[in-house]
């Protein structure tokens, strides 16, 4: 079965993340490295779905883990119609020039049934940094 023939799920959100280093907000001499990341959430399902909350797992270059939980994304709980995309940019300060983020969006379908959308791990790295 090809991707085009794949059955459409009632509730299916696709997440893509584009991270970047923010040198103008970073101060390596103070062990402060700031990263921005732009997230695109697209409703690839056949019914409306709403992002209710988020859970991030942030790991720095020393393997220290921080978990962040909160309502919505950038102060919103976007309701996405089928085919609709919501995009936002946020930031993450780290004490190391490299790290990773991964997480989960907690969502609800129009029927009130909750579901989770995994956010694949992505790399936060200062340019020209070897791991």
Curated annotation (Swiss-Prot):
PROSITE patterns found in the cross-reference section: APAG (PS51087)
Record domain ApaG: where: 7-131
Domain of life: Bacteria
The protein's name in its UniProt record: Protein ApaG
């Amino acid at each position: 079965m090809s991707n085009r023939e794949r059955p459409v799920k009632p509730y299916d959100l696709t997440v893509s993340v584009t991270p970047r280093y923010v040198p103008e907000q970073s101060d390596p001499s103070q062990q402060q490295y700031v990263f921005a990341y732009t997230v695109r959430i697209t409703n690839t399902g056949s019914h409306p779905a709403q992002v209710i909350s988020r859970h991030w797992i942030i790991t720095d270059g020393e393997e220290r883990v921080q978990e962040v939980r909160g309502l919505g994304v950038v102060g919103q709980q976007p309701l996405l119609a089928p085919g609709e995309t919501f995009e936002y940019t946020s930031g993450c300060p780290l004490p190391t020039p490299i790290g990773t983020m991964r997480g989960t969006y907690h969502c609800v379908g129009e029927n009130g049934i909750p579901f989770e959308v995994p956010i694949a791990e992505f790399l936060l790295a200062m340019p020209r940094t070897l791991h």
